[in-house]
């Protein structure tokens, strides 16, 4: 027994710790009476308060006085795991009080036995602690342990807390899982700062019960986009609850908590908690010593003019329930060099009369400031100065109403009734004509004007005509280009010009009509520019017959144009590989090399690779992992255009045209080639029912016998496209127009490769790709193209369009690639706030990527202007020592036109250069 006791004592001495809990490890010691006696003696020594835990244990080990008898009792202890890591398990022993009990928790020293469960053996370790918060260190990762706990008292009584409860450590390099819920417990005051309050936050453990957490918080009302505040929790005793201080009254905050693995810097997603801080007057009920008063309500100003520039003002406001200390009234004349008057008013005032004030300008401002010891609040009005001639006395005003205004109103009512009756009869006649028109067969190539007649509402009236207002029957509607939820777009001819006609669907609601008119007003206000899609005309006299005529761009959207270029390059690479393989086979046959098993194997591999490349070239219908899925095999009469709508087709009468009515997929693609002018007399000899158009650029040309080989895009061509977009956006910025949705899908391209920007400030309902996310209302937002300030504060400026232009450069460089290919729209905002941006794509020069990065600056004022972008892109084009294909074609067309118009030295009859006889495209 003496030897066993010495070994027991030696191990106690060897593993004594010095932390607050004074945990002591005793390895390879059995659970026996010696251990219980030493523990009881130690606890008895601690209760006397003469020595600390280490000294008591040492004294009991040498000269200890043991209790007379050990006895087991039943007590209300509970052991709970707090957290764990790869090498630690943290748990706490709590005294559970009865529902009616009030006795305090008894003093005890805890004995903890840890059995490590292994395949071939069982290792046991013993711990002693006078603290109920226990940390078991030095454990193996991903190991299981059975824990038994005893509570030992100084009188020799002990109780069993837990027996063989199983706990496990985490695996090495674990990935922290999703956080638990984060809740707001309460707001608490800050005694040292009465102008701020604090919030107590509580969160639940993560799924793996990790021990380390990070917390970030920021104010959503911040205008300078400050960095979020971060707090790291590394003390295991301070988990799951924290107080966020220095919160400003009446502000919005976001608090996020995540769990982290500090060994390899892995972390989980943030779990966010929005916090709405109460106002100062709600926290300190109407304490104007600490809080500013409410702003004055119902501020009104009545003015009278007796002499030129001399006014009398009667200013009134609502009397508040809780009065401020005083008011200050400020009156400002906005004219240069105008006067400023200031008045200090008593707290009981609710009105003030200014008998005479000189106002030189046409506008002036009135500000009423409510002041107290806690601050001030202001209400203001900007007013137009009334003229003396329009001011009448009350008696004259009554006479004016009785003898002039009332008779005029009666006359207007009679005229309105007469007009409504005449309009109702005209509408009924139109309805009868429309029913007859719907019964006739609809022809896609030519539509009679009666086919446009639809049912009109009785309460609709004609709008004021202007130079762009067109008659619906003067527009020849042809095939459908696309359709969306808002309406559909057809190809049409108006005054010998090819146009795109945007129509509303049958029975549009008020919101559709309003959005359609807003789109027309925007296009009219922007004006004409070579790189902006222009308006040709519109018809808005009846809501069921509204149409918008815009320029027709035959090559469709820039996005599809770039993706077709990407596919063309892939096919050319496959063809080149095929030719190289065939040439290698011919060379081997020409040299008449002796065939053996090795050469046979090489030829088989080459043939297999050739067939694989051909299959991939034929079946590849997608871009790459960075692009959205889209169909390349569909051939339509016109290229897809986002501004023209998509999906199913509906005619103007509302009948459905199935997709099988489209051109067959295997027909050759339409080649755009100008045709020579023919004799007009010969043209009109054909069938009168069939109309022939001279300009083949906008119509199907299925004869592919005389087709030109496709010219691949060069780097100079891509730079030319980007520069044209910058020129168009520069024009919009100079006219104070913010696009808000600049992307390749909203840029159109003509047959001569000229660029036209479309869909600026227009409706978004025709979009079908997953690049738009719902905003707070019914609108949608293009998340991956929006600037950081647009995502966080809904701020849209020309600088935010520059950010979108940088994303457009990424699309051009990658030939239609999807921005942020591996990031979902819901995660993008967090990454942008952390400073993440897209990496340089493959094949992109450093100069181009630097231009992209300058557009993505988090500070809007640090981004380049569109004028600067235009000049930088122009310099990059000159640096290539190459001329874009568009400029070459433009130069060749100009020279050809000059030669054709010069008939002095030619004996051949020349075609007249009168362009008005041709169908002219607007692009």
Swiss-Prot record:
Cellular compartment(s): Membrane
Domain Protein kinase: from-to ranges: 475-874
Catalytic-site annotation from UniProt: 741 (proton acceptor)
Cytoplasmic compartment segments: 421-923
Membrane-related topology note: Single-pass type I membrane protein
Positions carrying Phosphoserine: 608
Region (Disordered), start-end ranges: 656-687
Family indicated by similarity: Belongs to the protein kinase superfamily. Tyr protein kinase family.
Entries under PANTHER family matching the protein: TYROSINE-PROTEIN KINASE RECEPTOR, TYROSINE-PROTEIN KINASE RECEPTOR TORSO
Role: Probable receptor tyrosine kinase which is required for determination of anterior and posterior terminal structures in the embryo. During postembryonic development, involved in the initiation of metamorphosis probably by inducing the production of ecdysone in response to prothoracicotropic hormone Ptth. Binding to Ptth stimulates activation of canonical MAPK signaling leading to ERK phosphorylation.
Protein name: Tyrosine-protein kinase receptor torso
């Amino acid at each position: 027994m003496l030897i066993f006791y010495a070994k027991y004592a030696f191990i106690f001495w060897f593993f004594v710790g010095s932390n607050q809990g004074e945990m002591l490890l005793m390895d390879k010691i059995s659970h026996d009476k010696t251990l219980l006696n030493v523990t009881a003696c130690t606890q008895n020594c601690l209760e006397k308060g003469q020595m600390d835990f280490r000294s008591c244990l040492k004294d009991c080990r040498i000269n200890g006085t043991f209790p007379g008898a050990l006895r087991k009792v039943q007590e209300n202890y509970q052991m709970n795991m707090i957290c764990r890591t790869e090498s630690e398990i943290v748990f706490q022993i709590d005294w559970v009080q009865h529902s009616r009990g009030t006795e305090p928790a008894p003093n005890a020293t805890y004995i903890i036995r840890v059995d490590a469960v292994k395949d071939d053996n069982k290792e046991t370790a013993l711990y002693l602690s006078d603290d109920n918060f226990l940390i078991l260190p030095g454990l193996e990762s991903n190991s299981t342990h059975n824990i038994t706990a005893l509570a030992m008292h100084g009188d020799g009584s002990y109780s069993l807390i837990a027996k063989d409860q199983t706990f496990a450590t985490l695996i090495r390099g674990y990935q922290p899982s999703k956080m638990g819920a984060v809740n707001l417990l309460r707001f608490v005051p800050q005694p040292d700062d009465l102008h701020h309050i604090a919030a107590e936050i509580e969160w639940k453990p993560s799924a793996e019960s990790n021990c380390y957490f990070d917390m970030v918080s920021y104010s959503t009302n911040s205008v300078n986009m400050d960095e979020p505040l971060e707090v790291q929790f590394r003390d295991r005793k301070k988990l799951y609850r924290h107080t966020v201080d220095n919160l400003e009254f009446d502000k919005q905050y976001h608090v996020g908590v995540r769990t982290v693995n500090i060994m390899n810097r892995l972390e989980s997603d943030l779990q966010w908690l929005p916090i709405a801080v109460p106002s100062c007057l709600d926290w300190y009920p109407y304490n104007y010593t600490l809080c500013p008063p409410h702003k004055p309500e119902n501020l009104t100003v009545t003015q009278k003019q007796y002499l030129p520039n001399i006014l009398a003002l009667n200013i009134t406001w609502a009397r508040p329930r809780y009065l401020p200390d005083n008011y200050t009234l400020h009156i400002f004349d906005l004219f240069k060099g105008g006067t400023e008057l200031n008045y200090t008013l008593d707290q009981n005032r609710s009105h003030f009369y200014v008998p005479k004030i000189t106002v030189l300008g046409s506008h002036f401002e009135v500000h009423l400031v409510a002041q107290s010891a806690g601050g001030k609040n202001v209400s203001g009005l900007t007013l137009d100065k009334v003229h003396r001639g329009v001011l009448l006395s009350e008696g004259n005003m009554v006479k004016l109403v009785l003898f002039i205004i009332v008779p005029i109103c009666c006359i207007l009512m009679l005229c309105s009734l007469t007009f409504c009756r005449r309009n109702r009869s005209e509408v009924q006649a139109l309805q009868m004509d429309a029913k007859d028109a719907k019964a006739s067969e609809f022809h896609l190539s030519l539509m009679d004007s009666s086919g446009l007649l639809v049912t009109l509402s009785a309460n609709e009236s004609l709008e004021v005509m202007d130079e762009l207002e067109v008659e619906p029957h003067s527009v020849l509607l042809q095939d459908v280009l696309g359709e969306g939820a808002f309406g559909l777009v057809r190809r049409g001819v108006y005054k010998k010009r090819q146009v795109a006609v945007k129509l509303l669907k049958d029975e549009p609601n008020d919101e559709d009509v309003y959005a359609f008119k807003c789109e027309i007003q925007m296009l009219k206000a922007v004006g004409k520019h070579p790189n902006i899609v222009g308006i040709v005309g519109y018809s808005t006299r009846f809501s069921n017959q509204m149409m918008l005529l815009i320029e027709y761009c035959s090559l469709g959207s820039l996005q599809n144009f770039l993706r077709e270029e990407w596919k063309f390059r892939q096919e050319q690479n496959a063809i080149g590989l095929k030719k190289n393989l065939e040439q290698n086979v011919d060379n081997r046959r020409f040299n008449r090399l002796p065939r053996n098993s090795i050469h046979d194997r090489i030829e088989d591999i080459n043939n297999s690779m050739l067939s694989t490349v051909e299959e991939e070239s034929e079946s590849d219908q997608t871009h790459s992992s960075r692009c959205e899925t889209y169909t390349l095999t569909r051939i339509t009469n016109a290229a897809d255009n986002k501004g023209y709508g998509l999906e199913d087709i509906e005619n103007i009468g509302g009948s459905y045209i199935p997709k099988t009515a489209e051109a067959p997929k295997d027909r050759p693609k339409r080649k755009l080639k100008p045709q020579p002018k023919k004799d007009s007399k010969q043209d009109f000899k054909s069938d009168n029912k069939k109309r022939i158009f001279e300009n083949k650029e906008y119509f199907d040309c299925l004869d592919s016998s005389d087709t030109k080989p496709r010219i691949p895009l060069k780097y100079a061509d891509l730079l030319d496209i980007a520069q044209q977009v910058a020129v168009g956006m520069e024009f919009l910025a100079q006219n104070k127009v913010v696009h808000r949705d600049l992307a390749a899908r909203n840029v159109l391209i003509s047959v001569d490769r000229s660029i036209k920007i479309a869909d600026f400030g227009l409706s978004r309902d025709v979009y079908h790709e997953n690049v738009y996310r719902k905003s707070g209302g019914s609108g949608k937002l293009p998340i991956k193209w929006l600037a950081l300030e647009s995502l966080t504060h809904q701020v849209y400026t020309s600088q935010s369009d520059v950010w979108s232009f940088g994303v457009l450069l990424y699309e051009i460089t990658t030939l239609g690639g999807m921005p942020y290919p591996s990031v979902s729209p819901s995660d993008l905002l967090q990454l942008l706030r952390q400073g993440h941006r897209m990496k340089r794509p493959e094949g992109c020069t450093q100069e181009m990527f630097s231009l992209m990065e300058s557009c993505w600056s988090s500070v809007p004022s640090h981004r380049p202007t569109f004028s600067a972008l235009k000049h930088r892109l122009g310099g990059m084009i000159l640096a290539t020592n190459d001329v874009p294909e568009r400029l070459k074609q433009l130069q060749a067309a100009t020279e050809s036109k000059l030669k054709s118009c010069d008939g002095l030295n030619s004996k051949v009859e020349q075609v007249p250069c009168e362009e008005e006889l041709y169908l002219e495209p607007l692009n």
